[in-house]
């Protein structure tokens, strides 16, 4: 059987896309996925352009693959993702041995591209933006454990001055709501208990309904939570200016929606937020968090931060540190600013020294880590409900799972617990994980009421004096 290797860099959207590529090429070409690139007949590189020197990283990797192509002339090499979308034909100008260049919105055309190369075409470059077409061409989802990612939309319309996403993934396009619900229902039938909705800006979701209407993100959350078998619901990533009150109401009355939110702010200084074109203030961000905690007091908040943005002063950075303390963030993805080619911010003078950037980043991360450890210590001795994902990476004789607030917990258990919930008493706290002992299995929780088929069939419709229908069991 021919083999496929995919190297993936970047966000969860890229991870999701890579899994779909693997499933697609398995169904169309019988390709078996391998983690050993030297064994592969097709090599795909799914790239990310968010970080500094993304392009050079790509060509460095391609240079290693070039040597294998000399020994195996029929080897097909493809480059996809956001760097491919940015660079297009320039990739082949620097690396003419690359056979296929495709963007995030054209990965569904890979089977045809591969056939073209095998038919003798020199190269194929397709980095177009065909709306949401790719989701219509992908195979049925395959569950790999009790958790799954589902993409609900692509692209972003916000055009933050530092961000390449609108240029590499296009503007916001939402999947029809029925398509999203059908994919999640299929995953639930395969044993998925937790689903994570993906998009560059998920709370801007506006999916078309079967009757031509529009489903908002808040409505989608309620619909997904109602799918039988889905007991936990997460999403990433969202934008503060789209975080409307109807979403907050879902936190009030939908227990399936976890008490964890990743809501990027990037900076705590209004002056910097304006230069970033974030279109909100620090005060408006804090107002969202205040409303959330009014309906879900135990919710944990994580965020993204960029330090050393052009023009960021020491006072601006102190404003960021201040909001970190005020919001009491539990976690963060924080980075030193680096200009992305083609973005408005790349024209600004990069006037913060590298040493200052590094100092600020270290200071920020130290503060976040301190707060995270405080949250973890508060969990010591408490009971936490864990969705068991599988064997622990640190010790295959142990199991691992996550709390509702996204904490990793390792514990001693039995294989039949995988894919189910267990209640754990937290006994130890570490920097990146917790440890505990099982005090209750899912069978002991009474999560689901088992009802015989005959009792369901026995339900009959009865009307009251007003003609209102009710279903009751004949006794």
From Swiss-Prot:
Which residue ranges does the record assign to the Radical SAM core domain?
142-374
Record-linked PROSITE patterns: MTTASE_N, MTTASE_RADICAL, RADICAL_SAM, TRAM
Q: What this chain does, per the record?
A: Catalyzes the methylthiolation of N6-(dimethylallyl)adenosine (i(6)A), leading to the formation of 2-methylthio-N6-(dimethylallyl)adenosine (ms(2)i(6)A) at position 37 in tRNAs that read codons beginning with uridine.
Task: Name it.
Answer: tRNA-2-methylthio-N(6)-dimethylallyladenosine synthase
PANTHER family per record? CDK5 REGULATORY SUBUNIT-ASSOCIATED PROTEIN 1, MITOCHONDRIAL TRNA METHYLTHIOTRANSFERASE CDK5RAP1
Q: Which organism is it from?
A: Haemophilus ducreyi (strain 35000HP / ATCC 700724)
This entry's Enzyme Commission designation comes to: 2.8.4.3
Chain positions recorded as [4Fe-4S] cluster 2 binding sites? 156, 160, 163
């Amino acid at each position: 059987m021919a083999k496929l290797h995919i190297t993936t860099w970047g966000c969860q959207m890229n991870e999701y896309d890579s899994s779909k590529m693997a499933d697609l090429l398995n169904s169309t070409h019988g390709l078996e996925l391998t983690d050993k690139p030297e064994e592969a007949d097709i090599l795909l590189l799914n790239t990310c352009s968010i970080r500094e020197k993304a392009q050079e990283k790509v060509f460095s990797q391609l240079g290693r693959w070039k040597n294998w192509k000399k020994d195996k002339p029929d080897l097909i090499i493809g480059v996809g993702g956001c760097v491919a979308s940015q660079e297009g034909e320039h990739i082949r100008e620097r690396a003419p041995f690359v056979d296929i260049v495709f963007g995030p919105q054209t990965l569904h055309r890979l089977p045809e591209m591969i056939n073209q190369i095998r038919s003798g075409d020199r190269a194929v470059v397709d980095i177009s933006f065909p709306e949401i077409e790719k989701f219509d061409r992908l195979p049925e989802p395959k569950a790999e454990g009790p958790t799954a990612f589902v993409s609900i939309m692509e692209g972003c319309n916000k055009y933050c001055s530092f961000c390449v996403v609108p240029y590499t993934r296009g503007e916001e396009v939402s999947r029809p709501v029925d398509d999203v619900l059908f994919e999640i229902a299929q995953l639930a039938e395969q044993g998925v208990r937790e689903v994570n909705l993906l998009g560059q800006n998920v709370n801007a979701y506006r999916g078309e309904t079967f009757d031509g209407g529009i489903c908002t993100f808040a409505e989608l959350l309620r619909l997904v939570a109602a799918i039988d078998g889905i007991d936990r619901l997460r999403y990433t990533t969202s934008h503060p200016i789209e975080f409307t009150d109807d979403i907050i109401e879902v936190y009030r009355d939908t227990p399936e929606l976890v008490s964890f939110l990743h809501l990027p702010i990037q900076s705590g200084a209004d002056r910097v937020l304006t230069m970033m074109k974030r279109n909100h203030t620090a005060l408006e961000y804090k107002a969202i968090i205040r409303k959330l905690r009014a309906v879900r007091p135990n919710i944990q908040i994580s965020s993204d931060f960029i330090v050393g943005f052009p023009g960021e002063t020491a006072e601006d950075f102190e404003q960021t540190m201040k909001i970190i303390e005020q919001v009491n963030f539990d976690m963060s993805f924080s980075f030193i600013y680096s200009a992305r080619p083609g973005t408005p911010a790349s024209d600004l003078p990069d006037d913060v020294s590298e040493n200052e950037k590094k100092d600020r980043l270290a200071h920020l991360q130290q503060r976040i880590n301190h707060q995270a450890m405080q949250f973890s210590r508060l969990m010591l001795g408490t009971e936490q409900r864990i969705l068991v994902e599988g064997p622990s990476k640190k010790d295959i004789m142990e199991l691992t799972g996550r709390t509702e607030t996204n904490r990793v917990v390792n514990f001693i258990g039995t294989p039949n617990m995988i894919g189910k919930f267990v209640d754990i008493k937290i006994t130890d706290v570490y920097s990146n994980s917790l440890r505990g002992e099982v005090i209750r299995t899912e069978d002991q929780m009474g999560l689901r009421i088992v009802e015989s088929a005959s009792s369901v069939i026995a339900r009959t419709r009865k009307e009251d004096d007003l003609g209102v229908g009710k279903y009751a069991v004949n006794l």
